Amino acid sequence: MKSWNNTIILEFLLLGISEEPELQAFLFGLFLSMYLVTVLGNLLIILATISDSHLHTPMYFFLSNLSFVDICFVSTTVPKMLVNIQTHNKVITYAGCITQMCFFLLFVGLDNFLLTVMAYDRFVAICHPLHYMVIMNPQLCGLLVLASWIMSVLNSMLQSLMVLPLPFCTHMEIPHFFCEINQVVHLACSDTFLNDIVMYFAVALLGGGPLTGILYSYSKIVSSIRAISSAQGKYKAFSTCASHLSVVSLFYGTCLGVYLSSAATHNSHTGAAASVMYTVVTPMLNPFIYSLRNKHIKGAMKTFFRGKQ
């Protein structure tokens, strides 16, 4: 990859969330703590699901996949940021930047698709309870996860490969704590119209499509819950999807907030600080949301730890 004047570009500078020297120690401790909580929390969900045979159901199969993706998602960005803060070095190589961008797109896409699959699972469980295990059979569950991976990989590879031919100018500073594709593309010296079109199309198709599916699923779920006569039955039905609805609201709400913030304030640290919500905070909170009021997960964790003693 070459710059506009044919000199080789080997690295970018990640400016991070803040350039204030007095904040670096605080940011390091904060993000290290959040990273460890995220990894351990999601790892516990995976181990509890695997170790308890009662949780070998479609709902918890998808949840364990989401937890695995969240671990990978946060591991794509935070460790590099921690290294940069600790070493006082903002450099990321060109190859490292493209790789980070590729994996970030992969895992954010997987989060998106898995949340949609989980919404469909809740739709079948509440609207077609008698046929739930027939419809959500192991083959379909595996195919849904596989399809999520395939679509995410294709999107990630397409957008990352389209960055490779772009020539870059001498201004190589990225006002972010990771190589966010929109920020990187707009550092290029050439016309990025095609890249922008592909990015907007991907957001509309791969973001809007799953969100539409989630909204449709929940519209049917709400209709089914309203048809239940007893208050206890309504509460029980709603409680089975309350955690998922909370995670969906958090994920899409923070994503929307980030892009609105980025649109309002170009080339500032505001967008980077806002993106912490869906890149770090959401994966960290997911295990707490799913386990806080879920007696099956809490019971599986207790059994798991008792078995280790």
Curated annotation (Swiss-Prot):
Pfam families, per database record: 7tm_4
GO cellular component, one term: plasma membrane
Record's subcellular location: Cell membrane
Record keyword Transmembrane helix present: yes
Record function comment: Odorant receptor.
Alphabetized UniProt keyword annotations: Cell membrane, Disulfide bond, G-protein coupled receptor, Glycoprotein, Membrane, Olfaction, Receptor, Sensory transduction, Transducer, Transmembrane, Transmembrane helix
Membrane-spanning parts: 26-46, 55-75, 100-120, 140-160, 198-217, 238-258, 272-292
Protein name per UniProt: Olfactory receptor 7A10
Family as reported in the entry's similarity comment: Belongs to the G-protein coupled receptor 1 family.
InterPro entries: GPCR_Rhodpsn, GPCR_Rhodpsn_7TM, Olfact_rcpt
Family annotation (Gene3D superfamilies): Rhodopsin 7-helix transmembrane proteins
Disulphides: C97-C189
Extracellular compartment residues: 1-25, 76-99, 161-197, 259-271
GO biological process: signal transduction
PANTHER family: OLFACTORY RECEPTOR
Membrane-protein topology: Multi-pass membrane protein
